[in-house]
């Protein structure tokens, strides 16, 4: 069993996202450690890109701050190698096709596997085009994780059958960000995934408080939270780790109790 699937074995998974290098890689490293200490079952690491089309203003801002601070893909790989000495939970990268292309698909997959990454999410690569990337990652034992947005029943079933690691169910159309109300019938979406496959299904996009997290955990195998964490980092900068720790603990408790 892959390390990613194992993350869903002990009840509902809590999956936080962080943009690498905002405000700097040293702080990112500390934040990842405190997130794991406070219950994160799997961690998503964002590799910054200058035009992150799936992201709302919060994560876009983090991308630009990180790039301005001189973060590179190689520096992120080095940080992950350091983290892996202490962190055993699965970690996946979330980035854009261009970042992987410009590094070289095979080289990126090889280096990511070497430093101990478990998978990759490319939100701007449609399902039909994922085979351009998947073989290189498969060869390295990594999962290329598919996103499913509200779409036709047939398409949801098709993606679920082919999916690796876990399925990232997008709770609302549009970009990432905190929502007051989540309107998509995401429960129905997860049900369709489950009818097509036994792969774990996690819900993300727009979840920002324990009540929403508990509600989404009831409907799925896990909950993904990004913007709310990135906003704390934006607010507190190098002092963010303790604030993120507290937030992650409250979210994991809510997910656990659902």
Language-model features: locations:
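N-terminal amphipathic alpha-helix/helix-capping segment at the start of soluble metabolic enzymes
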Residues: 1-18, 80-84
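Hydrophobic faces of well-ordered beta-strands that scaffold small-molecule active sites
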Residues: 14-18, 43-45, 91-95, 120-122, ...
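Catalytic cores of alpha/beta
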Residues: 25-35, 151-161, 203, 207-223
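Glycine-rich phosphate-binding active-site loops on the catalytic face of alpha/beta enzymes
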Residues: 40-51, 117-121, 126-129, 171-177, ...
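Active-site beta->alpha loop and helix N-cap motifs at the rims of alpha/beta catalytic domains
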Residues: 47, 60-123, 255
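Glycine/Thr-rich beta-alpha phosphate-binding loop at enzyme active sites
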Residues: 61, 69, 156-195, 232-234
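Catalytic beta/alpha-barrel core
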Residues: 68-71, 116-129, 143-151, 157, ...
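Alpha/beta catalytic cores of nucleotide-metabolism and tRNA/nucleoside-modifying enzymes
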Residues: 76, 191-202, 208-258
């Amino acid at each position: 069993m892959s390390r990613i699937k194992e993350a869903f074995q002990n009840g509902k998974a809590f999956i936080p996202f962080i943009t690498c290098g905002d405000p700097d890689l040293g702080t990112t490293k500390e934040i990842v450690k405190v997130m794991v200490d406070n219950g994160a079952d799997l961690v998503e690491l964002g590799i910054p890109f200058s035009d992150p089309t799936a992201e709302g203003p919060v994560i876009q801002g983090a991308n630009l701050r990180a790039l301005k601070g001189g973060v590179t893909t190689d520096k992120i790989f080095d940080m992950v190698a350091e983290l892996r000495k202490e962190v055993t939970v699965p970690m996946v990268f979330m980035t854009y096709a261009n970042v992987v292309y410009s590094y070289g698909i095979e080289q990126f997959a090889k280096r990511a596997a070497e430093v101990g990454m478990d998978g990759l999410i490319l939100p701007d690569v449609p399902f039909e085009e994922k085979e351009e990337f998947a073989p290189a990652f498969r060869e390295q034992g990594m999962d290329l994780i598919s996103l499913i947005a509200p779409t036709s029943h047939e398409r949801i079933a098709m993606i679920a059958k082919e999916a690796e690691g876990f399925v990232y169910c997008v709770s609302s159309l549009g970009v990432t960000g905190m929502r007051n109300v989540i309107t998509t019938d995401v429960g129905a979406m997860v049900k369709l995934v489950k009818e097509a496959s036994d792969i774990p299904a996690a819900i993300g996009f727009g979840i920002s408080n324990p009540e929403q997290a508990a509600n989404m955990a009831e409907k799925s195998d896990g909950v993904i939270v990004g913007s709310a964490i990135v906003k704390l980092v934006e607010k507190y900068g190098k002092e963010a780790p303790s604030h993120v720790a507290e937030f992650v603990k409250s979210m994991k408790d809510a997910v656990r109790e659902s």
